[in-house]
C-alpha cells in the first residue's frame, strides 16, 4: 500500500469524496508521472445514525482521519446535484460542506466537480451509469472486484476526474478512445466482479 511516509516514490496523492448522508464514498489514488495507482477506497456508513448532527460529526471525523493517515495533497469532491427534494438537497449540501471543512482544517486544497463532468472524464460520456463508471475505473486502476456499494467507485471517479482536469494527461477530441490508444500500458481488460463482501 502506498504511504506518503514511505520513501518518495510518488508525486502526489488525491483523495476523492462522494458526499452522502447515509453512505459517503471515498477513494485515494497516487500519482507518479502519468501513472495512477489505487491506494484505498471504501464507504463511510451513516444510516445507523438518526441524528443529522451526529452524521455530520462522523463525516468530519472520518475525513479528518483519512487525511491524517494518507496525507493527500489535494481533495476532489462531487458537487451536489439539483433535485426536487429540497430537504434532501439541504442535507447533502451540509454533508459536502462538512467534508470540505475537514479538508480545510488540515490545509488540504479542495476541488469540486459536477457529476456529469466526472462521468465525462472517466468514461467519455456525461450520461454514463454508476456501473459503467465503476467498470472503467477497474480497468484504469487494475482492481477486479467492484464493491456492492458504488459510492466507493464514485469517489474514485472524482479523484481520477481531478487528475485529468489538472492536465496530467493530454486529451484530444478523441476522449477515452484517444487516451487508450496512446496509453495501452495504463488500461487493460480485467473481468469485473461484483463483490458481496461488506465494505468497512
Swiss-Prot record:
Homodimer which binds Holliday junction (HJ) DNA. The HJ becomes 2-fold symmetrical on binding to RuvC with unstacked arms; it has a different conformation from HJ DNA in complex with RuvA. In the full resolvosome a probable DNA-RuvA(4)-RuvB(12)-RuvC(2) complex forms which resolves the HJ. CDD domains: RuvC (cd16962). SUPFAM superfamilies: Ribonuclease H-like. Belongs to the RuvC family. Mg(2+) 1 binds at residues 18, 151. This is Crossover junction endodeoxyribonuclease RuvC. It holds the Pfam family RuvC. The gene is ruvC. The active site is at 18, 78, 151. Binds 2 Mg(2+) ion per subunit. It catalyses: Endonucleolytic cleavage at a junction such as a reciprocal single-stranded crossover between two homologous DNA duplexes (Holliday junction). Mg(2+) 2 binds at residue 78. It is found in: Cytoplasm. GO terms for biological process: DNA recombination; DNA repair. One of its GO terms (molecular function) is DNA binding. The RuvA-RuvB-RuvC complex processes Holliday junction (HJ) DNA during genetic recombination and DNA repair. Endonuclease that resolves HJ intermediates. Cleaves cruciform DNA by making single-stranded nicks across the HJ at symmetrical positions within the homologous arms, yielding a 5'-phosphate and a 3'-hydroxyl group; requires a central core of homology in the junction. The consensus cleavage sequence is 5'-(A/T)TT(C/G)-3'. Cleavage occurs on the 3'-side of the TT dinucleotide at the point of strand exchange. PROSITE patterns: RUVC. Its EC number is 3.1.21.10. It comes from the Bacteria. Its cofactor is Mg(2+). It comes from Cytophaga hutchinsonii (strain ATCC 33406 / DSM 1761 / CIP 103989 / NBRC 15051 / NCIMB 9469 / D465). GO terms for cellular component: cytoplasm; Holliday junction resolvase complex. InterPro entries: RNaseH-like_sf, RNaseH_sf, X-over_junc_endoDNase_Mg_BS, X-over_junc_endoDNase_RuvC. Keywords: Cytoplasm, DNA damage, DNA recombination, DNA repair, DNA-binding, Endonuclease, Hydrolase, Magnesium, Metal-binding, Nuclease.
Amino acid at each position: 500500500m502506498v504511504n506518503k511516509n514511505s520513501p518518495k516514490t510518488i508525486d502526489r496523492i488525491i483523495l476523492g469524496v462522494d458526499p452522502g448522508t447515509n453512505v459517503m464514498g471515498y477513494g485515494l489514488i497516487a500519482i507518479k508521472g502519468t501513472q495512477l495507482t489505487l491506494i484505498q477506497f471504501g464507504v463511510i456508513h451513516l444510516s445507523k445514525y438518526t441524528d443529522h448532527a451526529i452524521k455530520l460529526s462522523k463525516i468530519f471525523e472520518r475525513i479528518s482521519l483519512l487525511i491524517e493517515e494518507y496525507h493527500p495533497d489535494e481533495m476532489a469532491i462531487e458537487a451536489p446535484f439539483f433535485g426536487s427534494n429540497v430537504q434532501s438537497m439541504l442535507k447533502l449540501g451540509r454533508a459536502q460542506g462538512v467534508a470540505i471543512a475537514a479538508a480545510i482544517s488540515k490545509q488540504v486544497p479542495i476541488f469540486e466537480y459536477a457529476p456529469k463532468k466526472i462521468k465525462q472524464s472517466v468514461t467519455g460520456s456525461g450520461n454514463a451509469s454508476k456501473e459503467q463508471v465503476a467498470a472503467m475505473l477497474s480497468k484504469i486502476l487494475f482492481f477486479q472486484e467492484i464493491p456492492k456499494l458504488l459510492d466507493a467507485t464514485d469517489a474514485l471517479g472524482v479523484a481520477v476526474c481531478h487528475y485529468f482536469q489538472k492536465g496530467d494527461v493530454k486529451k484530444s477530441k478523441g476522449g477515452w478512445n484517444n487516451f487508450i490508444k496512446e496509453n495501452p500500458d495504463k488500461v487493460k481488460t480485467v473481468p469485473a466482479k461484483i463483490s458481496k463482501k461488506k465494505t468497512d
